[in-house]
């Protein structure tokens, strides 16, 4: 459709008005809606964002350390801390400037304080406590996984309770979200998280040397290469087939993959650190096994929820989030399970699945609305590197020992 020039000009002026109006003190929206600044530094992203109460993002800024950590072969906490220290002030300043919001207009500051890398959490928390004291603003400490779980509600109305699968570089958990700060933990990883496994497999395969993968995270590199791979050329056993609970384990799979890589290196007569000819097939088989493992544990969690009336009978929902949730193949695997069990599957877009300041600000909005966990600026808060989410129900899930009817995991590439 073509637009008349005059109509286009009017639209342009309206859009200009909308963007200048955002966040300005005299603007109805900013004046009537409470504003929250969110700050994230739990791992390797320095993020900040200002949101209004409706979930409108007024301004955001994100500094990713990904490329630095790719070069050093993983996150070195002291390096992460230094990069947060160098960037936090600028990132927060940018988010405020882009929103056209002055600190005096904020209703609260929300910051990730758990779980995460101690050195990284410390930078965000110290900055935030100084900031709230300086501007005399309430402080809302945020649980990073609670924020991942609630992000979807910023984008569309999703009523509690819903089931959530959170998969990232640091976490793997299944929980029922019953309220903003009310979770039932059904499953968690017993060793490492799927993103960590994919990052380590990518490193072992030296994918950083692959022309298409030099700036991609391990998970992204595996997803890209798997598209041209034949997953049937390597057969890895899906973990925990004989354990009838909803917990996860990925270390054994990583071991299987490493052994396969070593065998291939010997066959091809090449040294570790050289790209194998079969990287696409190994990527495809690894991704498939991760996807199948996540799908099976989630299937059992859905059956447990159904047996115990933990989800509503009308539009029961599974929310998939966290960095690994941006993987399209994994999304398809989960959609096979939700289709078979009558749930709707919701995944935030990739940019909201990985760590960012927006999700923290949104969690602040949710808590502000309900008046939960809002502290005066003077209260001293400590960060917690380890912090479980919700009430631990993993023993009850295990005791239920639910057997799965087999669902064919024919996942299209
Ligand atoms: O949520 P996130 O940004 O940070 C943590 O809290 O860990 O997740 C980062 C993780 C990394 O391990 C990365 O390899 C993985 O998410 N990841 C992916 C994809 N994109 C990022 N894993 C699989 N497929 C992807 N497309
Ligand atoms: Zn995360």
Positions of predicted regions on the chain:
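Conserved phosphate-binding catalytic cores of ATP/NTP-utilizing and phosphoryl-transfer enzymes
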Residues: 27-34, 141-163, 363
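Glycine-rich phosphate-binding loops at beta-strand->alpha-helix junctions
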Residues: 314-334
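Adenine-nucleotide phosphate-binding core of ATP-dependent small-molecule kinases
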Residues: 242, 247, 251, 260, ...
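A short helix-loop
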Residues: 29-34, 42, 49, 59-60, ...
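N-terminal mitochondrial targeting presequence
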Residues: 1-33
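N-terminal beta-alpha supersecondary unit
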Residues: 33-107, 111-115, 144, 148
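Conserved phosphate-binding/catalytic loops in two-lobed NTP-binding clefts
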Residues: 141-142, 317-318, 335-360, 377
